[in-house]
Curated annotation (Swiss-Prot):
Official protein name in the record: Efflux pump notK
Biotechnology (record note): Notoamides have been shown to exhibit antitumoral activities. Notoamides A-C show moderate cytotoxicity against HeLa and L1210 cells with IC(50) values in the range of 22-52 mg/ml, but the IC(50) value of notoamide D is greater than 100 mg/ml. Moreover, notoamide C induces G2/M-cell cycle arrest at a concentration of 6.3 mg/ml.
PANTHER family named among the record's database cross-references: MAJOR FACILITATOR SUPERFAMILY (PTHR23501), MAJOR FACILITATOR SUPERFAMILY (MFS) PROFILE DOMAIN-CONTAINING PROTEIN-RELATED (PTHR23501:SF177)
CDD domains: MFS_Azr1_MDR_like
């Protein structure tokens, strides 16, 4: 070793750090962020809204179509899978889609997700039997997951930072609107044409979506896929983790559909599936820990308190949200004898004020750069609204069921999009895609968990109430009668007993929602009180630079919360 080498210099007289600095100076500067504006932004957002409308419609459209489906296939034991298959794949595949968006062109991955969704729609629409319909619904869920996750990701890619919160709020409003009108369309198609049109209708809408994606989904130049070999990408997809997560969710779904409804909770198969759910869930987290950076849910991403508290907040907030979304129409149809369409119309206050709350929080976040206060306010208002919904009775007036919807809707809307905004805003650019996938997984798996749990709560408490007031009635007949058909199938004392049983089940589901809303208040207090990073691409004047200094050194802030 020469003296120069020993002293950390080369024969040319430059120290190693000097060379590193020189090389860094010689490198071309990173491209300045370019964001979509004007017509291009409007075209991209229109495409995102249309594809979200398409994907979210099918989450709830099958609910009112189930009576017609069971008339054709005569498989009552498969009823839970017609909706559950979609939810299971949306939740379990979300992190996988996040990885695909990281390593491939966002336009290509988005296009593939839409195509998979449309293929699933064709399979479901043309299904000759129940098994084929379930496969079609699973494919729809798989494609839906990529479309919904990609929609949020594209907003973060193409929109200026100060506009993102507002646009994500608008996107959430479209999502909620779609899930509300889904059952309306499902009921209309099933009554007037055939349930198969619940799926055929996706094709004439999906065609223009594909064309719009091809024409307008151009990602800004500063967003580039991460370089990786095919072997590396395959490892990143974490297929063992995906398989364990999916099978654990299937076990839980089966156990909750059996328990107390078609089989006793003490039945061997019910206990076995619950045990398998626990074992597979533990195995999933063990595999994720072993996989490290290759895990579909990299546990390191969840380490910062800002991340895991927001992810948990989003998970629990959807507990409160989904129960009201699905069981408020059941209340209207069963207790008030309304049609599927009328029940949807009477649920519009919830949807309208959810949209208003979402857009309001997006606007306020853009102005104040605060997050936690809106999550706290969201939890408080949602708790009050859920408590009022719990008080609904058989003879409740319009004012009694519209007022709580307004409070609950604006409450849930205020906080629903905040966790996604927080995680995307505090993530490093290369981590935005997988972080979005993890957040979507939390939101979707909460649907898979809690919608199934709510169905079990509803059925078990309804049957318990029915057994106490009308022990001679056939519980299977009550379970298999559609909510809108209750007043037609039962009369007199039987109808009174069934309505009382339905109300008992619905109130317990609303109590479940109330517990979730109250828990979000507690969770919001654990979320770090931090302002978003400067929402502009870079300081353009002294005032913004000074504001950045007030927030503290950028490097320190990134160390604390960036993922």
């Amino acid at each position: 070793m020469t003296k120069d080498e020993d002293s950390g210099t080369t024969d040319g007289g430059y120290s190693t750090p000097d060379i590193a600095v020189q090389e860094k100076q010689d490198q071309p500067p990173a491209p300045e962020p370019e964001y979509a504006t004007g017509f291009r932004l409007a075209a991209i957002m229109s495409t995102i809204f249309l594809s979200t409308l398409l994907a979210a419609l099918d989450i709830g459209i099958v609910a009112t179509a189930i009576p017609g489906i069971t008339d054709d296939f005569h498989r009552l034991d498969d009823v839970g899978w017609y909706g559950g298959a979609c939810f299971l794949l949306v939740g379990s595949s979300a992190p996988m889609w996040g990885k695909l968006y990281k390593y491939f062109s966002a336009q290509l991955v988005y296009l593939v997700s839409v195509v998979i969704f449309l293929v699933g729609s064709i399979v479901a629409a043309a299904a000759p039997n129940s098994a084929a319909l379930i496969v079609g619904r699973a494919l729809q869920g798989w494609g839906c997951s990529g479309t919904l996750g990609g929609s949020v990701l594209m907003i973060s890619y193409v929109a200026e930072p100060q506009k993102r919160a507002m646009l994500i709020g608008m996107w959430m409003s479209v999502f909620m609107f779609s899930t509300i009108i889904g059952p309306l369309l499902g009921g209309a198609f099933t009554s007037e044409v055939t349930w198969r049109w619940c799926f055929w209708i996706n094709l004439p809408v999906g065609g223009p979506v594909i064309a719009l994606v091809v024409l307008f989904f151009e990602v800004p130049k500063h967003i580039k896929p991460a370089p990786a070999t095919w072997v590396e990408i395959l490892r990143q997809l974490d297929l063992p983790g995906f398989a364990l997560l999916l099978t654990s969710l299937v076990c839980l779904t089966v156990a909750l559909q059996w328990g107390g409804q078609t089989k006793s909770w003490s039945y061997g198969s019910v206990i076995a599936t619950l045990v398998m759910w626990v074992v597979l869930t533990i195995a999933f987290f063990v595999v994720e820990w072993i996989q490290g950076d290759y895990a579909m849910v990299p546990l390191a991403l969840l380490k910062p308190r800002l991340v895991w508290t927001n992810a948990l907040y989003g998970w629990i907030a959807n507990l409160a949200n989904f129960q009201v979304l699905f069981y408020l129409p059941i209340y209207f149809q069963s207790i008030h004898g309304q049609s599927a369409i009328a029940s949807g119309v009477n649920s519009l206050p919830f949807m309208a004020f959810f949209a208003a709350g979402s857009m309001l929080s997006g606007f306020l976040i853009g102005k104040t750069r605060l997050l936690q206060p809106y999550e706290f306010a969201s939890g408080v208002l949602a708790t009050v609204g859920a408590a009022l919904l719990y008080t609904l009775d058989i003879d409740s007036s319009k004012a009694r069921y519209i007022g709580p919807q307004v409070i609950f809707g604006i409450g849930i809307g205020l906080g629903n999009q905040v966790p996604m905004t927080a995680l995307e805003s505090f993530s490093k650019p290369e981590h935005i895609a997988p972080t979005t996938g993890v957040m979507l997984m939390c939101n979707s798996i909460s649907g898979a968990y809690f919608v199934t749990a709510a169905q079990s709560i509803f059925a078990n408490y309804m049957l318990k109430e029915l057994a106490s007031i009308a022990p001679d009635m056939d519980p299977i007949q009550v379970l298999t009668t559609g909510a809108s058909e209750v007043s037609h199938v039962f009369q007199g004392a039987e109808l009174e007993a069934v309505l009382a049983a339905y109300l008992a089940g619905i109130k317990d589901v609303f109590a479940f929602s109330l517990a979730g809303a109250a828990f979000t208040v507690v969770l919001s207090l654990a979320i770090p009180f931090k302002k978003l990073p400067n929402m502009f691409a870079g300081p353009s004047n002294g005032q913004e630079e000074e504001e950045g200094k007030k927030d503290g050194p950028a490097e320190k802030k990134e160390d604390e919360v960036a993922v």
